[in-house]
Structure formats: structure tokens, C-alpha cells
């Protein structure tokens, strides 16, 4: 493609609204433009990269036996009401009414639609297994869309759905998709890691996320340092090993004693005032889970994992108690809640609290705490369980080795759904014995547009983006320094045509711009390779070749150029862990 005929509206300065590097560079490189909050236009360069990601994903889905379909983005509300997600999904589901007053939504995901499609066609075990996928625009009405393509309201996604006759078949489908994802992300050239994850609003009993590793990632991943173990999970899912040793739940403890703590609301203030360490205090945190009051107890120096609490209770929606609810349930202002005399029946405690007794806690009374709390003697705990966020001081829950944290960007998620949707929507089939059974499902998502942003987050420098050759807008840019020297320009065009004949997706910068502008734009956009054609080099029988990833420049001879170029290109692909 001749860039003199291309649309590349690059920017010299970072847009004021852009916070993360991928957002800045996608805007500056002329790849996207904002339409409104969280919604972007894909310009030619940006769409080219998105399409390359989609092509790789499509190839791996097809190779794994999935079949491509295309489903409507606008979905009838009655399907979502069948599964109960019309109310549960919350405000991220953009709801609309047609002229007849019927409810619809813009699809954030397609479990309901695909289940409706399959239940109308599949009647026998002979038609299973079945795996259908699409690559399509999704819409989620994020409360705070930010970071460009990283967390927009509208995005491009690949979503696949498997249907099997039993759990064994569903496991095979899940593993097939898991391996297909690994192949796709490897082919793209990303440094990624699959991790255990919570299933969230999608539901199901087991899932993995695929994260692109980047220091700027939103998500924190707990990883076992022992590579043989391989344990990795996001913080929502990461388990904390159960305490070892004897339980102190019913150990001897002095009688409860109230102590005045005037104006001391936080753990830090209370412990400093009483002259004790934070690990001697029990925090009482109050929530509603699907509207039901729930209390959770953790050690004063720990952070509660509300996802673990929600899953333990068995609910969908968890919310921190309001100030009014705290006063109603404790009889005290915020900051003085405790488990003794609490007007909440369901109290859960982190299992770490079994290892000690004689705790300090709120007294459910203003400006007052209690000392000598025994959880076994003084209050009724429904269940002790893993409720806190893992730390780097905790051992690996699988092997006991050390844990370390790393940052990641979620670009894929695979779920075992079981019969969650097939039962609620009556998607059944007749088995070998003629009995009606619910289909066993799985769903598998990849953020196609998000991968483009993630690649930049992982690979960039002060000059711009550094794309893997597989998904760069163009793999190589031929830069002519000829200016008005038509002989140089003609030679540059010869190289461009030769590269195109070799199957290289090349751009030819034939714009009437200064060399500095061309070099700056090439670095900004992130073409993996640059081929510079100048009069001086041609006289010396060479052209200059630049590796964008390393910045290394070499000279390729005019005589024997093709073989020298192929060898150089192969080295660059190999540096990305790829085969040219």
C-alpha cells in the first residue's frame, strides 16, 4: 500500500483523555478515534491489526473443530428473563424497547441466543458434540469506560459455545478450546499466561483466564515460584491454604471487656490507641448478598475477598452495607461493628481466625471496642472458610512454595457452564436410552480488539508501538529518501513490488514528507521492519534495514538482496518466538 494514498492521521502529542500507553499510541498512530465515551472508530491501520488478530483466532477455532456463525447483536429480553440474567446482569446490560414496547438488549454476550438456537435444532445425542463461534461486536454499558480499547463499552469479541451430551464430553471440549487459545496467543507473539479464575456473571463451576503479561496490567496474578507446580490464579480466585496446627476456637480466654475508643474508626487508629498489632484485631465487614444481610470476619491486617464471600454464600450480587444499614444492624456508627450482639444471622469468618483467640473487635456501640473476644464462646459463626485475599507472604496453596505477584491484562476466558443455561432454557436432547437430558455447555471468549491494545501495552518504547509481525498493520515499511530524485523513488518502488510478490504485507512511504517525519511515523506506528532506500546507499550497493523491536540497523546488499532479506526477516520473527 502506498502511504500517499492511505489515511494515517498521526498526532504529535498525547491526547489529554488518554491514560495508558496503548490508548495514547493507538490515537497518536491514527489507528482509532473516539466517537463518544467508550466507543471508538477503527481507522484503516487499526482495523487492519484487528482483522489480523481475528484471522489467527478464526484459523485456530476452525482447526479445533468449531463452526462459525453470526448472531444478532440485538437480543429479545424474554430470552434473558428465562435465565434470570435480565435482572441479575445489572446496569451493564443496555436495555431498549421497540415501537411495540417489547424489551430488547444490546448483547454483552450470547449464551441465551446460542442456547435458543441450539435447543430448536438439536434433539438427539447423535447431533452432539457441537461447537459454534462468532466474531462480532459486543456492548457493555461500563460505568467508567477508560483506557481506550482496554475497557470500552463497545468491543470486538470472539465467543464460542460448546454443547455436549455429558461431563466427559464437556471436559474434552473445554480442553480443546484451552489448547486452541494457547496456540492462538502463541501465534500472535504475545507473552501470556493462563490462570485460574472466577466465573462471575457468566456462571459455571470452573474457568481460566488468559492474561497478556504487562507491568501496566489492571489485574494482579498470584503465581507459584516453583515452575514445576505451575499454579497461577487471579486475586479473586487465588486460594489461601487452610491453617495448620491446633484450632484455638474454644481455647481459654478471659471474659469480654469493653474499652473506650473515642473517635477511633479505622483498624490503624484503634490498634495504635490500644497499643496492639493489627493482627490482634478482628474486622467485621457487613454486606448484602442478593439483598440478604451477611457479616464477614477477617484479621485486622488482612483484606477480605468479597468474591469468595459471594461464592460461599451462594449469591449473585454482593454490595457493601450502606451507612444506614450499618447503624440498623449494629446500633452504632460505621467503624464499631463487631460479631457479638450483631443483628445479622449469617456470620462467616476467615479460617485464619481459628489459629488464635483473645481478639479485639468492635462492640456495636459508638466509640467502644471489646477485648478478650473468643469466636467459639461469644458468637455464632455459620462457617469458617477461605475468605481473604492472598498475599506474597502466603505459601502456594498447591505445593507450599513461595508466591509472587505479576500484572496481566485479560484477553481470553474459558468457562465450564455445566447445565446452568440448558436447564433454565430447557435445551435438552434424547440420550442413547431415549431419556431426556440437558446439554452440558461451555463458553469461550477472546477480546479481539483488546488484544491489539494489549500487544502495545506489552511492547512499546518512547518512540511508539512495537507490534509483533503477525498483527502489525503492515509487517514492513519501505521508506524512500529520494525526495525529487526519481531514480531513488523508482528503486524504492521496485523493492516494494518485489516484497509484495514475496507475500510480504508491506507499506511504501512515498509521501512528500521530510525523512524525519517518515522515520518518526514508522516508529510510532510500530512496523516490525523498516527498509530505507536512499541515494547514498544505492551508490554503495546497499539498503538500510531496521529492526523496530531492538532498534538495530543493518545493511542489506543489493546483490543477493532476496536471500539476505529472508534471513534477516527470519531472525526478527524468531526473536518474537515465531516462525516466518
Swiss-Prot record:
Predominant subcellular localization, coarse grouping: cytoplasm
CDD domains in alphabetical order: ProRS-INS, ProRS_anticodon_short, ProRS_core_prok
Indicate whether Aminoacyl-tRNA synthetase appears among the record's keywords.
yes
Q: Which gene encodes it?
A: proS
InterPro entries from the UniProt entry: aa-tRNA-synt_IIb, aa-tRNA-synth_II, aa-tRNA-synth_II/BPL/LPL, Anticodon-bd, Anticodon-bd_dom_sf, Pro-tRNA-ligase_IIa, Pro-tRNA-synth_IIa_bac-type, Pro-tRNA-Synthase_IIa_type1
Cite the record's note on assembly: Homodimer.
The record lists the organism as Maridesulfovibrio salexigens (strain ATCC 14822 / DSM 2638 / NCIMB 8403 / VKM B-1763)
Keyword Protein biosynthesis assigned to the entry: answer is yes
HAMAP family in the cross-refs: Pro_tRNA_synth_type1
**What name does this protein carry?**
Proline--tRNA ligase
PANTHER family for the chain: MITOCHONDRIAL RIBOSOME PROTEIN L39/PROLYL-TRNA LIGASE FAMILY MEMBER, PROLINE--TRNA LIGASE
Reactions catalysed:
tRNA(Pro) + L-proline + ATP = L-prolyl-tRNA(Pro) + AMP + diphosphate
Check the record and name the NCBIfam families matching this protein.
PRK09194.1 (NF006625), proS_fam_II (TIGR00409)
Quote the cellular component terms of the Gene Ontology held in the record: cytosol
Amino acid at each position: 500500500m502506498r502511504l500517499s494514498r492511505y489515511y494515517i492521521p498521526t498526532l504529535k502529542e498525547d491526547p489529554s483523555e488518554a491514560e495508558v500507553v496503548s490508548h495514547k499510541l493507538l490515537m497518536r498512530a491514527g489507528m482509532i478515534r473516539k466517537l463518544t465515551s467508550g466507543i471508538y472508530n477503527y481507522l484503516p491501520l487499526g482495523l487492519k491489526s484487528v482483522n489480523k488478530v481475528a484471522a489467527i483466532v478464526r484459523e485456530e477455532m476452525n482447526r479445533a473443530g468449531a463452526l462459525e456463525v453470526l448472531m444478532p447483536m440485538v437480543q429479545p429480553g424474554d430470552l434473558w428473563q428465562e435465565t434470570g440474567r435480565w435482572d441479575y446482569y445489572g446496569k451493564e446490560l443496555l436495555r431498549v424497547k421497540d415501537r411495540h414496547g417489547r424489551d430488547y438488549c444490546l448483547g454483552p454476550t450470547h449464551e441465551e441466543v446460542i442456547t435458543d438456537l441450539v435447543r430448536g435444532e438439536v434433539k438427539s445425542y447423535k447431533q452432539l458434540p457441537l461447537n459454534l463461534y462468532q466474531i462480532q461486536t459486543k456492548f457493555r454499558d461500563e460505568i467508567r469506560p477508560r483506557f481506550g480499547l482496554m475497557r470500552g463499552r463497545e468491543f470486538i469479541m470472539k465467543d464460542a459455545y460448546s454443547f455436549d451430551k455429558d461431563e466427559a464430553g464437556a471436559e474434552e471440549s473445554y480442553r480443546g478450546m484451552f489448547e486452541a487459545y494457547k496456540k492462538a496467543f502463541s501465534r500472535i507473539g504475545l507473552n501470556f499466561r493462563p490462570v485460574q479464575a472466577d466465573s462471575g456473571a457468566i456462571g459455571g463451576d470452573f474457568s481460566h483466564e488468559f492474561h497478556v503479561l504487562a507491568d501496566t496490567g489492571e489485574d494482579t496474578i498470584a503465581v507459584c515460584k516453583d515452575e514445576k507446580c505451575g499454579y497461577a490464579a487471579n486475586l479473586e480466585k487465588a486460594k489461601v491454604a487452610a491453617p495448620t496446627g491446633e484450632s484455638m476456637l474454644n481455647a481459654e480466654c478471659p471474659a469480654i471487656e469493653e474499652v473506650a475508643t473515642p473517635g477511633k474508626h479505622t483498624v490503624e487508629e484503634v490498634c495504635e490507641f490500644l497499643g496492639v498489632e493489627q493482627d490482634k484485631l478482628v474486622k467485621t465487614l457487613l454486606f448484602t448478598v442478593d439483598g440478604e444481610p451477611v457479616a464477614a470476619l477477617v484479621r485486622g491486617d488482612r483484606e477480605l475477598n468479597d468474591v469468595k464471600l459471594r461464592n460461599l454464600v451462594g449469591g449473585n450480587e454482593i454490595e457493601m452495607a450502606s451507612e444506614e444499614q450499618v447503624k440498623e444492624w449494629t446500633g452504632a456508627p460505621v467503624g464499631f461493628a463487631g460479631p457479638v450482639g450483631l443483628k445479622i444471622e449469617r456470620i462467616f469468618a476467615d479460617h485464619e481466625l481459628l489459629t488464635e483467640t483473645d481478639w479485639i473487635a468492635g462492640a456495636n456501640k459508638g466509640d467502644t471496642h471489646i477485648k478478650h473476644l473468643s469466636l467459639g464462646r461469644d458468637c455464632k459463626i455459620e462457617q469458617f472458610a477461605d475468605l481473604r485475599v492472598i498475599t506474597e507472604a502466603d505459601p502456594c496453596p498447591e505445593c507450599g512454595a513461595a508466591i509472587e505477584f505479576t500484572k496481566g491484562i485479560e484477553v481470553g476466558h474459558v468457562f465450564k457452564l455445566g447445565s446452568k443455561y440448558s436447564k433454565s432454557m430447557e435445551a435438552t436432547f434424547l440420550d442413547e436410552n431415549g431419556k431426556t437430558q440437558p446439554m452440558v455447555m461451555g463458553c469461550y471468549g477472546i477480546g479481539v480488539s483488546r488484544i491489539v491494545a494489549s500487544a502495545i501495552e506489552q511492547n512499546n518504547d518512547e518512540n511508539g508501538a512495537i507490534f509483533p509481525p503477525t498483527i502489525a498493520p503492515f509487517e514492513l515499511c519501505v521508506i524512500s529518501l529520494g525526495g525529487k530524485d526519481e531514480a531513488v523513488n523508482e528503486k524504492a518502488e521496485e523493492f516494494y513490488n518485489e516484497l509484495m510478490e514475496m507475500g510480504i504485507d508491506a507499506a511504501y512511504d512515498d509521501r512528500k514528507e521530510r525523512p524525519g517525519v517518515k522515520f518518526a511515523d514508522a516508529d510510532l506506528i510500530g512496523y516490525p521492519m523498516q527498509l530505507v532506500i536512499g541515494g547514498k546507499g544505492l551508490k554503495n550497493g546497499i539498503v538500510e534495514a531496521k529492526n523496530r523491536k531492538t532498534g538495530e540497523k543493518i545493511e542489506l546488499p543489493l546483490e543477493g538482496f532476496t536471500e539476505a532479506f529472508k534471513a534477516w526477516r527470519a531472525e526478527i520473527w524468531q526473536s518474537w518466538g515465531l516462525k516466518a
